[in-house]
Amino acid sequence: MAQAQYAGTGRRKNAVARVRLVPGTGKITVNKKDLEEYIPHADLRLVINQPFAVTSTEGSYDVHVNVVGGGYAGQSGAIRHGIARALLQVDPDFRDSLKRAGLLTRDARMVERKKPGLKKARKASQFSKR
């Protein structure tokens, strides 16, 4: 019999992560690299493991992720969102705890666009009264 696989798609800023959960030992692979190798920041690795901590399933699933777009922070948020959605397929009873932790909600914050006449989105050149 084929091993059960659970899939989820996560998004954050410009990053899109396609996540597959397979029952296993807790190994996380991102774009065919180990998690520690792909994401060097420890705090972002904690962000990725949040859904497992909330549902008490640490070390129960191997995670295979394909992620494109964005930087480290956006990709970590997208992976977290994807893992949370995949865990929902594992057990629908996780919905309440994941929702309460805010892990099922797509973070809608995006980069503010640059306005004409300004140097950046809000930064203006120095004002001189005289």
UniProtKB/Swiss-Prot annotation:
InterPro entries linked to this entry: Ribosomal_Su5_D2-typ_SF (IPR020568), Ribosomal_uS9 (IPR000754), Ribosomal_uS9_bac/plastid (IPR023035), Ribosomal_uS9_CS (IPR020574), Ribsml_uS5_D2-typ_fold_subgr (IPR014721)
GO biological process: translation
Any Pfam family the entry gives: Ribosomal_S9
Coiled coil residues, start to end: none
Family annotation (PROSITE patterns): RIBOSOMAL_S9
Organism domain of life: Bacteria
GO CC annotation, single: cytosolic small ribosomal subunit
Keyword annotations of the record: Ribonucleoprotein, Ribosomal protein
Single GO term (MF): structural constituent of ribosome
Recorded family membership: Belongs to the universal ribosomal protein uS9 family.
Protein name: Small ribosomal subunit protein uS9
Organism of this sequence: Streptococcus thermophilus (strain ATCC BAA-250 / LMG 18311)
